[in-house]
């Protein structure tokens, strides 16, 4: 798991994951950070109250089979999904091409990928209490 001070943590034999139908599979060698994102964009693209994002350096991510299909979700980011089953898989910001965020639910064994902080906390829905005790960081983006 990633550390809050920005250091990456290697995963030993790697973490594996993919989409619901198995068409898109990936392997992660090291995780940079994990956080809950409460921003409007993540809430809308997940169809849920918030997203849990696992950030990895691009060189630590390999696609084992088909790659995701991408679409622009905003002027600053694009999202990857499986074109066969529609599973949302990734998020990449134009300003940070060296890293990719993967959805925690796409990992085969996500239990060790606990969030370290909340992002976009001012946009958090009032009834969401999961991770409320974690540190909070803000975003200026509104969608």
Which ranges hold each PLM region?
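A short Gly-Trp-Pro
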Residues: 1-143
């Amino acid at each position: 798991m990633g550390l809050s001070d920005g250091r990456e943590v290697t995963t030993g034999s790697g973490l594996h994951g993919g989409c619901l139908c198995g068409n898109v599979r990936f392997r992660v060698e090291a995780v940079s950070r994990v956080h809950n994102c409460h921003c409007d964009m993540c809430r809308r693209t997940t169809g849920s109250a918030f997203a849990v994002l696992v950030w990895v350096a691009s060189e630590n991510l390999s696609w084992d089979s088909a790659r995701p299909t991408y679409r622009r979700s905003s002027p600053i980011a694009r999202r990857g999904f499986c074109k066969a089953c529609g599973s949302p898989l990734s998020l990449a910001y134009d300003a940070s091409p060296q890293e990719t965020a993967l959805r925690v639910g796409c990992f085969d064994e996500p239990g060790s990928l606990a969030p370290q902080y909340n992002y976009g906390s001012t946009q958090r829905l009032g009834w969401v209490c999961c991770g409320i005790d974690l540190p909070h960081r803000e975003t200026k983006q509104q969608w």
